[in-house]
A protein has these predicted regions:
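Surface-exposed, interaction-prone regions used to assemble/regulate multi-protein complexes
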Residues: 1-137
């Protein structure tokens, strides 16, 4: 299970109000930045960075019932996963990719984020050379 021994840290907590967000668009325009847009009933946000190393999409139901470690699920379910985005420390996915990459082991250094909305879960790996930013649109 990929979430075993990982630590999820809430990020952008004070910037993103509670809402029923859905992921509407994933833009991959490398000339500018890559964006994941969230549309809520009252709010709209976009997460952007220069380049994602990896992006994986899941239905929320599948991710929360079959992929997420049960202990992690219990920890965050009490708030109905309202934070929307978490940075994953000690990411096993990053470690797996480091060992299977063409780089020397330990040199990939991606940051792992999980975005949970009402209908989807997106896991993204952002290159350590690129920062994930948030803005309203």
């Amino acid at each position: 299970m990929e979430t075993k021994n990982e630590e999820w840290v809430e990020i952008f907590k004070d910037m993103i109000p509670r809402d029923n967000y859905k992921i509407k668009v994933l833009l991959t325009n490398l000339a500018d930045e890559q964006e994941i847009r969230l549309i809520g009933e009252k709010n709209r946000f976009k997460f952007s960075c220069f380049c994602y190393d990896e992006a994986r999409f899941f239905s929320r139901e599948l991710y929360l019932s079959a992929i997420l470690d049960k202990e992690m699920f219990k920890k965050f379910e009490k708030d109905n996963f309202q934070n929307v985005i978490y940075e994953v420390k000690n990411s096993q996915l990053v470690r797996k990719l480091e060992y299977t990459s063409y780089y020397d082991p330990g040199t990939l250094h991606s940051q792992h984020y999980i975005i949970i909305t009402q209908d989807s879960v997106v896991e993204i790996l952002v290159s350590a050379n690129s920062d994930l930013s948030i803005s309203q649109y």
